[in-house]
């Protein structure tokens, strides 16, 4: 079930590795989309706005969890590329202990602070109860988010991007069925949407864990390999925490933006919710290319093949540009149809118009978005997650400036510019950072090679 990414044509390898990731990300988006569509169509605009008002806070916490799990997997990919199986198993074991500890702490803290957080976000009075209920139950499912994402990250680190897709297809179907039953049949509203998401995530996590234990023989551990090791946890944390914090820092800018947008009223929140869900769906392919590059870069660094890393990044550029152009064209002709999934386009004319404008401005900048994703994940895969985290700071600063300066002056148009400006700001940091990282590692590998030759001559 493992796959070596250190040989073969980079374009073909990355593309084939990306496709299952893309489908998996699409199905993962269906968790959120199913909630949003069914809530918007069967409960109402206020319920849709309530779910949407939690988006940035949701990403703030769950983005940290997912980023940390992906960070824990980077050393695992590097060790797999270096064929150090025993140390690989020790890293998997200690990643498990870290996930358990973080899962307990984050669940307790976030559930306890749900209502104060939504009040701090100046959530409109007519939707704050629904928003607090929804996000509180989502936070209660954090342990299942850890479980599924850590197992999936391990599989990807070992070169298997297909198996997580199969589990997501199943659980997405379960999520949609539960949404329909709990929201429509039992009239549970936003609570039903949150419970459906939690149950679906739990099913995905448990089934994928069972599969990992049974099928990946390379992970069968001795009692000694299961032991907690401080040095191993330090290495895992040195990768995982910056990647988690990168998502969190980026999300802080989103939270500030959400705070500013909430002040524009429920209709604006609903419009951005519908447009934002569509954008997330369309950007899945770009995120998948980036995720593939993290594993690809990690394995090839372990094999001391930085030439393949450069080739892989160039191949990823081609994929990003091709997809971005196609996505822009598809959105140009199908935006009303997509928005119609969330809202009644005949009665909510003003909200539909705002959502269309928002999607237009965002889709114009998909190419820089794709480029920053490729550079960021490549840097992370090469082990420089703190450097990649700094790009999140650039995004946060850009969104903060827009929230505090442009939105008060330009109103909704200022909100439309938030993502494009943040993406460009991150690109201005990440491209030089990528060039420096690869050159720095090439010099280190060359120095190590020369030292070995000198030692051999001396002997």
How should these model regions be labeled?
Residues 1-18, 76-141, 185-241, 297-364, ...:
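Short alpha-helical transmembrane segments in multi-pass integral membrane proteins
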Residues 5-43, 56-71, 75, 100-107, ...:
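N-terminal transmembrane alpha-helices
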Residues 16-35, 137, 148, 171, ...:
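Transmembrane helical elements of multi-pass membrane transporters/channels
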Residues 21, 25, 37, 74, ...:
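Transmembrane alpha-helix boundary and packing residues in multipass membrane permease domains
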Residues 30-49, 118-125, 181-188, 248-281, ...:
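Helix-terminus/linker motif at the lipid-water interface of multi-pass membrane proteins
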Residues 48-108, 145-164, 271-335, 369-391:
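Small-residue-rich hydrophobic transmembrane alpha-helices
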Residues 60-63, 175-180, 205-209, 281-284, ...:
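Hydrophobic transmembrane alpha-helices of multi-pass small-molecule transporters
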Residues 69, 138-156, 164-172, 193-206, ...:
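Short runs within selected transmembrane alpha-helices of multi-pass transporters and secretion channels
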């Amino acid at each position: 079930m493992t796959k070596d990414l250190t040989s073969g044509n980079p374009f073909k390898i990355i593309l084939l590795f990306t496709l299952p990731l893309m489908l998996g990300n699409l199905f993962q988006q269906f968790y959120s989309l199913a909630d949003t569509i069914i809530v918007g169509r069967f409960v109402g605009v206020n319920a849709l706005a309530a779910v949407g008002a939690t988006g940035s806070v949701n990403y703030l916490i769950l983005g940290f969890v997912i980023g940390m799990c992906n960070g824990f997997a980077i050393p695992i990919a590097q060790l797999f590329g270096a064929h150090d199986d025993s140390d690989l198993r020790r890293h998997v074991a200690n990643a498990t202990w870290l996930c358990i500890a973080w899962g307990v702490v984050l669940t307790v803290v976030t559930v306890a602070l749900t209502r104060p957080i939504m009040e701090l976000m100046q959530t409109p009075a007519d939707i704050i109860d629904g928003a607090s209920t929804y996000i509180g139950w989502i936070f209660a499912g954090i342990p299942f988010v850890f479980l599924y994402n850590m197992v999936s990250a391990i599989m990807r680190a070992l070169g298997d991007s297909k198996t997580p897709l199969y589990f997501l297809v199943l659980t997405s179907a379960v999520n949609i069925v539960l949404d329909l039953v709990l929201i429509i049949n039992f009239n549970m509203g936003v609570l039903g949407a949150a419970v459906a998401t939690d149950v679906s995530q739990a099913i995905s996590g448990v089934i994928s864990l069972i599969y990992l234990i049974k099928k990946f023989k390379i992970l069968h551990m001795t009692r000694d390999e299961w032991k907690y090791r401080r040095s191993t946890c330090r290495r895992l944390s040195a990768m995982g925490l910056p990647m988690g914090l990168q998502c969190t820092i980026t999300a802080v800018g989103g939270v500030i933006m959400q705070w500013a947008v909430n002040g524009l009223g429920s209709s604006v929140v609903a419009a951005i919710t519908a447009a934002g869900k569509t954008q997330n769906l369309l950007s899945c392919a770009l995120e998948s290319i980036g995720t593939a590059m993290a594993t690809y870069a990690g394995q090839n660094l372990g094999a001391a093949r930085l030439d393949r890393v450069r080739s892989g990044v160039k191949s990823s550029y081609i994929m990003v540009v091709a997809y971005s152009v196609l996505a822009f064209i598809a959105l140009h002709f199908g935006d009303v149809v997509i928005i119609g999934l969330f809202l009644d386009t005949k009665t909510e004319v003003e909200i539909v118009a705002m959502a269309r404008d928002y999607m237009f401005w965002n889709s114009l900048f998909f190419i820089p978005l794709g480029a920053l994703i490729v550079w960021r994940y490549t840097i992370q895969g090469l082990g420089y997650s703190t450097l990649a985290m700094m790009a999140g700071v650039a995004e946060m600063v850009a969104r903060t400036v827009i929230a505090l300066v442009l939105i008060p002056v330009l109103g909704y148009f200022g909100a439309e510019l938030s993502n494009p400006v943040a993406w460009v700001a991150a690109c201005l940091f990440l491209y030089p950072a990528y060039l420096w990282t690869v050159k720095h590692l090439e010099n280190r590998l060359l120095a190590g090679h020369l030292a070995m030759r000198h030692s051999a001559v001396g002997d």
